């Protein structure tokens, strides 16, 4: 059985459907075949190699399923070519092609659909919002699987709790390699703010390495530090309350708490060091970890800050240099300066 799609990202509905199809058809093997980026109708966010890797992580514990890189390797854009490839590979096998009801209405437009029907049989599951057209079922001799109970679409995973509907091991892999970091930022931030976040991430990584800390963790915390910065006040206050924050000097500091909460509870990033660094970057507590200090400094000292009015009273270049040798001293100097501005 062939199951094509972007899988960008793979989610629990994909796994549910695949298991249901294997069981219903009694298929010996189901192959996930990720579409080549150049041929998918919508922009694909993750690289070809990242999508293949995520699928392999997900399918390790599912021996009846495997990943095929045919479409990606061949830069193939037609399902007909995909099915031909599998027919050549398994000449005596009965081939099935798994589709959702959203694709059922498009079958008549598929390349070489008449020949394709001779090579395989279509198996269709019903997706939310795409009712089954019985006339098309008859026309294309489609076998129905029933309705998928999970209302999920890869295009709707970002900016909501639905991202948690990614298999746990895949979710861990995504965050380990920051596969969707820019996409997550773009969901909530405009371009200038996102670029600020990426610069903070880069400087945080540099400072972490200089202080013998993990650069990747620092980059992640730095890049995500302002994730919630542009949310409206009412939403920030609501998220802060849910996160347990009721006492704060101004609603403008709430993005740190909201951002940490969103990363953990929407996107499933369970890293206490990253959470702490983001949480503490607006109102630093008495006790700050090294990573906390690094994110605070990277936010205040990233390269473009030199053009901002508030930073004219400090030497950003000198403080960055100092932070590589004496992190705590650089933090204390910067914090003292920032607090002096707040008093004025």
From Swiss-Prot:
Annotated positions binding ADP: 196, 226-229, 255, 281-282, 299, 305
Domain HD: 193-304
Annotated region described as Ap4A hydrolase, given as residue ranges: 191-344
A Pfam family per the record: CTP_transf_like
Pathway: Cofactor biosynthesis; NAD(+) biosynthesis; deamido-NAD(+) from nicotinate D-ribonucleotide: step 1/1
GO biological process: NAD biosynthetic process
Record: residues binding Fe cation: 196, 225-226, 299
Listed GO MF terms: ATP binding; hydrolase activity; metal ion binding; nicotinate-nucleotide adenylyltransferase activity
Reactions that this protein is recorded to catalyse: nicotinate beta-D-ribonucleotide + ATP + H(+) = deamido-NAD(+) + diphosphate; P(1),P(4)-bis(5'-adenosyl) tetraphosphate + H2O = 2 ADP + 2 H(+)
CDD domains for the chain: HDc, NMNAT
The enzyme's E.C. designation: 2.7.7.18, 3.6.1.41
Free-text function comment from the UniProt entry: Catalyzes the reversible adenylation of nicotinate mononucleotide (NaMN) to nicotinic acid adenine dinucleotide (NaAD).
UniProt similarity note: In the N-terminal section; belongs to the NadD family. In the C-terminal section; belongs to the Ap4A hydrolase YqeK family.
Protein name: Probable nicotinate-nucleotide adenylyltransferase/Ap4A hydrolase
Naturally occurring in which organism (per UniProt): Mycoplasma pneumoniae (strain ATCC 29342 / M129 / Subtype 1) (Mycoplasmoides pneumoniae)
């Amino acid at each position: 059985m062939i199951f094509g799609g972007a899988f960008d990202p793979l989610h629990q509905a994909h796994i549910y459907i695949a298991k249901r199809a294997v069981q219903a058809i009694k298929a010996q093997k189901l192959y996930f075949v990720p579409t080549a980026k150049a041929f998918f109708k919508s922009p694909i966010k993750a690289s070809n190699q990242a999508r293949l890797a995520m699928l392999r992580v997900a399918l390790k514990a599912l021996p009846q399923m495997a990943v095929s890189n045919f479409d990606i390797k061949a830069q193939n854009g037609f399902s007909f070519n995909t099915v031909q490839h599998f027919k050549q590979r398994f000449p005596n096998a009965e081939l099935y092609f798994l589709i959702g009801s959203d694709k059922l209405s498009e079958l008549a437009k598929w390349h070489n659909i008449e020949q394709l029907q001779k090579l395989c049989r279509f198996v269709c599951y019903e997706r939310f919002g795409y009712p089954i057209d019985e006339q098309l079922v008859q026309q294309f001799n489609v076998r129905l699987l029933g309705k998928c109970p999970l209302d999920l679409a890869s295009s709707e995973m970002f900016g909501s709790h639905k991202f948690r509907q990614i298999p746990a091991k895949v979710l861990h892999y995504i965050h380990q390699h920051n596969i969707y970091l820019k996409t997550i930022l773009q969901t909530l931030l405009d371009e200038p703010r996102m670029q600020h976040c990426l610069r903070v991430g880069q400087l945080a990584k540099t400072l972490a390495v200089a202080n013998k800390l993990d650069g990747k963790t620092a980059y992640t915390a730095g890049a995500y530090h302002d994730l919630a910065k542009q949310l409206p006040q009412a939403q920030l206050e609501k998220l802060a309350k849910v996160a347990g924050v009721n006492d704060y000097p101004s609603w403008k500091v709430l993005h740190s708490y909201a951002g940490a909460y969103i990363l953990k509870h929407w996107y499933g990033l369970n890293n206490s060091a990253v959470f702490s660094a983001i949480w503490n970057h607006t109102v630093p507590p008495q006790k700050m970890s090294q990573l906390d200090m690094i994110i605070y400094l990277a936010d205040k000292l990233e390269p473009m800050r030199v053009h901002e009015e508030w930073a004219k009273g400090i030497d950003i270049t000198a403080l960055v240099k100092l932070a590589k040798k004496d992190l705590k001293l650089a933090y204390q100097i910067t914090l003292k300066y920032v607090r002096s501005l707040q008093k004025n």
